[in-house]
């Protein structure tokens, strides 16, 4: 087994509702609703779909006082920590703090006067709410645009440090920071620079990454690269797609780096003329059927005996394609043969049995350690 070489950057730990961010806390995955916030039913339904996909934290845009009231109604109907996304109007921040927000996404520099910022900080402190400073390459301050000519890593850093200084001077330290851009290299440069300057937890993201496919690639490169360097404490994959897809991709990135597991890690061959069954169809069916599984597990599905045995030996459950019957491995050992035409049903049954075994063992260990 290859040891994971990733060493996370030490950061302070803050709390977003029931979820800790930074320090030794797991890297959390979050998304943002794209419904009209005032449509409470639609927003709640979307949040619940994201939670089913594994979301640790959800963000909701609150552009008006009417939306703030809707936020309060949403807060009562979901249990996942909620971040209220606020711009310009400090009164909205004060309202959602009273309505039960777990975190405020604001930039202190665009909330208004020092007095307004102090009021927001006082409300956050009173309610035990954290904040996120969110710097974006598309909305840099005009003087920084003039100074640097274009968005640069240094410009994003300078903007972030301005906002950080405001909170530091008010002795408020329960915040995380993001410095997002739509360009992979700019994003990575900004986060690297920021990570050298502060010990606050960092919220990773590539903003306006694009549609599903291109946005996934951009995010995997930028965020995956930063995570490999130990940078990042929470993340959002920003896509022009459904928010639950963002959650799934976020966990796939973490899973690929061995940083966190959420469900099945499928190992499957790309298929060729040696395949003894239609690997693509089998994998599509398995991913759909087993989407609800949250227990970490490796499942290998290889269409022939060339690479199949080697992959199967490293998986919890492995299948090596053959006709008319395929060979099953369990925990790295040969187990039994199954009808190749019944692969999907048989693999699903084995996976669910294995999940039950693992969860029962986990429960017994918890009881044993607490007694």
UniProtKB/Swiss-Prot annotation:
Root EC class: oxidoreductase
Known cofactor(s): [4Fe-4S] cluster
Organism: Acinetobacter baumannii (strain ATCC 17978 / DSM 105126 / CIP 53.77 / LMG 1025 / NCDC KC755 / 5377)
Name the record gives this protein: 4-hydroxy-3-methylbut-2-en-1-yl diphosphate synthase (flavodoxin)
Superkingdom of this protein's organism: Bacteria
InterPro entries: Dihydropteroate_synth-like_sf, IspG_bac, IspG_bac-typ, NO2/SO3_Rdtase_4Fe4S_sf
SUPFAM superfamilies associated with the record: Dihydropteroate synthetase-like (SSF51717), Nitrite and sulphite reductase 4Fe-4S domain-like (SSF56014)
Family named by the database record: Belongs to the IspG family.
Function in brief: Converts 2C-methyl-D-erythritol 2,4-cyclodiphosphate (ME-2,4cPP) into 1-hydroxy-2-methyl-2-(E)-butenyl 4-diphosphate.
EC number(s) reported in the record: 1.17.7.3
Co-factor note (free text): Binds 1 [4Fe-4S] cluster.
Catalytic reaction equation(s): (2E)-4-hydroxy-3-methylbut-2-enyl diphosphate + oxidized [flavodoxin] + H2O + 2 H(+) = 2-C-methyl-D-erythritol 2,4-cyclic diphosphate + reduced [flavodoxin]
A GO MF term: iron ion binding
NCBIfam families listed in its UniProt record: ispG_gcpE (TIGR00612), PRK00366.1 (NF001540)
Binding site for [4Fe-4S] cluster: 269, 272, 304, 311
GO biological process, one term: isopentenyl diphosphate biosynthetic process, methylerythritol 4-phosphate pathway
Pathway stated in the Swiss-Prot or TrEMBL entry: Isoprenoid biosynthesis; isopentenyl diphosphate biosynthesis via DXP pathway; isopentenyl diphosphate from 1-deoxy-D-xylulose 5-phosphate: step 5/6
Disulfide bonds: none
Keywords recorded for this protein, A-Z: 4Fe-4S, Iron, Iron-sulfur, Isoprene biosynthesis, Metal-binding, Oxidoreductase
């Amino acid at each position: 087994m290859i040891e994971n070489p990733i060493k996370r950057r030490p950061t302070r730990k803050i709390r977003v509702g029931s979820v800790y961010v930074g320090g030794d806390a797991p890297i959390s995955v979050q998304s943002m609703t794209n419904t009209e916030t005032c449509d409470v039913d639609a927003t709640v339904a979307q949040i619940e779909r994201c939670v089913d996909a594994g979301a640790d934290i959800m963000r909701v845009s609150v552009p008006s006082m009417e939306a703030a009231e809707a936020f309060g109604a949403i807060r009562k109907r979901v249990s996942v920590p909620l971040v209220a996304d606020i711009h310009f109007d400090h009164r909205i921040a004060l309202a959602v703090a009273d309505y039960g927000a777990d975190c405020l996404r604001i930039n202190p520099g665009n909330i208004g006067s020092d007095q307004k910022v102090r009021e927001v900080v006082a409300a956050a402190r009173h309610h035990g709410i954290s904040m996120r400073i969110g710097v974006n390459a598309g909305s840099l301050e005009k003087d920084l645009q003039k100074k640097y000519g274009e968005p640069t890593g240094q410009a994003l850093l300078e903007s972030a440090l301005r906002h950080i200084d405001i909170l530091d001077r008010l002795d408020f330290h329960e915040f995380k920071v993001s410095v997002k851009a739509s360009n992979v290299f700019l994003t990575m440069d900004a986060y690297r620079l920021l990570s050298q300057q502060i010990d606050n937890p960092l919220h990773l993201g590539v903003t306006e990454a694009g549609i599903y496919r291109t946005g996934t690639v951009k995010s995997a490169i930028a965020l995956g690269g930063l995570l490999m360097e130990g940078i990042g404490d929470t993340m959002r994959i920003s896509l022009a797609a459904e928010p639950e897809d963002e959650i799934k991709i976020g966990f796939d990135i973490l899973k690929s780096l061995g940083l966190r597991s959420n469900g099945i890690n499928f190992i499957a061959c790309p298929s060729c003329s040696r395949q003894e069954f239609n690997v693509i169809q089998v994998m599509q069916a398995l991913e759909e059927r087993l989407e609800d599984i949250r227990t970490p597990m490796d499942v290998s599905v290889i269409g022939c005996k060339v690479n199949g045995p080697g992959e199967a030996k490293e998986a919890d459950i492995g299948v090596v394609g053959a006709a008319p019957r395929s060979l099953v491995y369990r925990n790295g050992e040969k187990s039994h043969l199954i009808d190749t035409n019944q692969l999907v049903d048989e693999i699903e049954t084995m996976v669910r049995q294995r999940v039950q075994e693992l969860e029962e063992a986990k429960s017994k260990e918890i009881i044993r350690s607490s007694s």
